[in-house]
């Protein structure tokens, strides 16, 4: 059980600051807990894919934490995990249908990794460790902070891989945000041949390793 699950039922500024800092940096689900690595490594070959999956996971975390916290006193302890999974699966289905309806190209690009959010340890972990033990407002904000932390990690890794692999940034972002976003695409440099390693799975592992190393260096300097 992490220290967030023991927060008092208060709403002081320090509580919100702690929740936010834990979710985004200190206890980042991707860079500290190393959870949800399968979708992180698989779809982070571009900012568009990374942002799409990050927003979907953020939405699922907020909704599942909200429902679990609302009904935490009514859910029988013995069958709480199957109930949490059902709640998460329902939320993921809603996200999947919305993406299929409004961002179909991105939906096709992300493929199986949208329904796989159901099995993401981040989501079920926050429901069990935090939402089931804390009031609604704290649970919702915890879902937001944890989801934001994962989303930022995804986008940062996706940006690195897209820049190195294709020389672009925000390529295909119109599939997520609409036609108006076509102007956001940036071609940083022209590549006669793509640096395939960056956009293939080995590049994802190398990129994640570099990000983890940078974070550890920053944390060590802050402690000094």
Curated annotation (Swiss-Prot):
The record's listing under Pfam families reads: Rnf-Nqr
Provide the membrane topology annotation. Answer: Multi-pass membrane protein
Keyword set, alphabetical order: Cell inner membrane, Cell membrane, Electron transport, Membrane, Translocase, Transmembrane, Transmembrane helix, Transport
Keyword Transport on entry: yes
Q: What is its main location?
A: membrane
Biological process (GO) annotations held by this record are:
electron transport chain
Residue intervals passing through the bilayer? 51-71, 81-101, 105-125, 140-160, 194-214
Q: Where in the cell is it found?
A: Cell inner membrane
Give the EC number(s) listed in the UniProt record: 7.-.-.-
Assembly behavior: The complex is composed of six subunits: RnfA, RnfB, RnfC, RnfD, RnfE and RnfG.
Q: Which family does it belong to?
A: Belongs to the NqrDE/RnfAE family.
- Report the protein name in the record: Ion-translocating oxidoreductase complex subunit E
Q: Which organism is it from?
A: Pasteurella multocida (strain Pm70)
**Protein's gene:** rnfE
């Amino acid at each position: 059980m992490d220290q967030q699950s023991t927060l008092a039922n208060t709403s002081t500024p320090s509580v919100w600051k702690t929740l936010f800092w834990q979710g985004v940096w200190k206890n980042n689900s991707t860079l500290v807990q190393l959870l949800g690595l399968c979708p992180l490594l698989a779809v982070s070959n571009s900012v568009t894919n990374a942002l799409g999956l990050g927003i979907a996971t953020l939405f699922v975390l907020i909704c599942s934490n909200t429902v679990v916290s609302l009904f935490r006193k009514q859910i029988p302890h013995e069958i709480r995990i199957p109930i949490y999974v059902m709640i998460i699966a329902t939320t993921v289905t809603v996200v999947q249908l919305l993406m299929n309806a409004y961002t179909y190209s991105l939906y096709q690009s992300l493929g199986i990794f949208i329904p796989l959010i159901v099995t993401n340890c981040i989501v079920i972990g926050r429901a069990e460790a935090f939402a089931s033990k804390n009031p609604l407002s704290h649970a919702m904000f915890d879902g937001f902070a944890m989801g934001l932390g994962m989303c930022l990690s995804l986008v940062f890794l996706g940006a690195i891989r897209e820049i190195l692999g294709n020389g672009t940034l925000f390529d295909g972002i119109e599939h997520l945000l609409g036609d108006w976003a076509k102007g956001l695409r940036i071609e940083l440099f022209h590549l006669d041949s793509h640096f395939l390693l960056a956009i293939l799975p080995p590049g994802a592992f190398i990129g994640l390793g570099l990000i983890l190393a940078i974070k550890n260096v920053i944390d060590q300097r802050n402690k000094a």
